[in-house]
Amino acid sequence: SPGHWFYKEWIRKAAERNMLYLHFTMDDNLSLDEKIKARYEGMYSGVFYDRYIRGLWTVAEGLIYTMFNKDYHVVPSVPRDYEEYLISCDYGTLNPTSAGLWGLCEGKWYRVREYYYNGRKERYQRTDEEHYAAIEELAGDLSIRKIIVDPSAASFIEVIRRHDRFMVEQASNRVLDGIRDVATQLNAGDIFFCDCCTDCIREFGLYRWDEKAAEDRPLKTDDHAMDDTRYFVRAAFQPSRFSF
């Protein structure tokens, strides 16, 4: 980000500090062959492409997931031969609680269905037990490998453990890494969203960067399904998929 202290204090002041500033792009890395460079170019778009491929200090602005395409990423809610299932959950009290059931089919992950409850809109705050009952309904009689939950939701995690049906895991809450990883999987065509997941699809069109913030961060609105999607991607895809 151009708001980073190193950019402001050193790169922008290179002349007055009597320093030589050289700009490099990925193409300047002679250790990368064309096949690897093509793969990396396909992994990123938007601000991440400008930063990681073009080597630019680019400000994060506008929609976060500009690569999300309803015509491509949204698919019919039809039966598929899913091989395994995960559930991701972003827990809220007054803010919405969002959970997604994900199924793996032929190497691709699908958000099969979702649970989205807005206590403020409904004017009723559900208890942890009521949210858990909704998760049970979301899972049905499926075998769920694990539930990935917002790490701040300690009381809800304890409720899941006490019922002893699901294995529960605290989600990674490294926001920028998670956003980058979701963008990578959208670009790669590895995650899709069944058209019944209307709240998640709606949030993709609203999730934006906070352009007034000094550092990169999303606006804390319309981000609940986006958060649970981020938790899912960080858990479902191995870290090596994202590392150089």
Label the predicted regions.
Residues 24, 53, 99, 147, ...:
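A residue-level signal for conserved active-site and pocket-lining positions in enzyme catalytic cores
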Residues 100, 105-218, 237-244:
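Mg2+-dependent endonuclease catalytic cores in nucleic-acid-processing enzymes, primarily RNase H-like
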Residues 29-89:
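ATPase catalytic-site recognition across NTP-hydrolyzing enzymes
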Residues 80-104:
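Gly/Thr-rich phosphate-binding beta-strand-loop-beta motif of the actin/hexokinase/Hsp70
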Residues 22-24, 53, 112, 171:
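Hydrophobic residues at beta-strand termini and immediately following loops
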Residues 222-244:
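Charge-patterned, long linear interaction tracts outside catalytic cores
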Residues 1-43:
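ASCE P-loop NTPase helicase motor core
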Residues 19-23, 86, 168:
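Conserved beta-strand scaffold positions in the cores of enzyme catalytic domains, especially
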